[in-house]
């Protein structure tokens, strides 16, 4: 996707798909091969909502921070809590030669990840879920997604 930001045009990745993966003995996650090029500039992993992890390409993280977090009012308690959630929980890393990233223990604990995970595209970032949690979330969403879409489309 191409977007305009101030004086500059930029290409924003659109991360799609669902991939079953397994963490190795050192808690490294292999990113799907077809998505790795989006993460060449670096990776930011942070706590996500609903018990998952958010995995941002460096450029998408910067855009997310500029659009969402930098605009928060530091005098608001809710804003400070949300900023802490993302910043304190974040970990910067690089892909290794095999396309892997290291997931820290606090991040693994947040997502209650054991070894089997699902990597799901979420437009400009990836979500990493414990495989069993992903199955539950998908089953819960299955019957209600049409109703949610209809409600959200109302003016």
PLM regions: where:
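Flexible "stalk/tail and boundary" regions
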Residues: 1-21, 25, 35-93, 97-98, ...
């Amino acid at each position: 996707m191409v977007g305009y930001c101030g004086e500059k045009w930029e290409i924003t990745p659109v991360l799609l798909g669902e991939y079953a993966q397994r963490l190795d003995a050192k808690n490294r996650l292999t990113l799907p091969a077809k998505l790795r090029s989006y993460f060449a500039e670096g990776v930011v992993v942070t706590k996500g909502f609903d018990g998952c992890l958010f995995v941002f390409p460096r450029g998408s993280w910067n855009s997310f921070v500029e659009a969402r977090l930098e605009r928060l009012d530091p005098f608001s308690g809710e804003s400070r809590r949300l900023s802490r959630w993302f910043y304190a929980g974040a970990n910067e890393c690089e892909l290794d030669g095999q396309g892997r990233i290291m997931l820290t223990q606090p991040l693994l604990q947040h997502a209650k990840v054991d070894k089997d995970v699902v990597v799901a595209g979420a437009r400009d970032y990836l979500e990493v879920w414990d495989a069993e949690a992903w199955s539950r979330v998908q089953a819960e969403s299955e019957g209600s997604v049409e109703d949610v879409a209809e409600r959200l489309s109302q003016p």
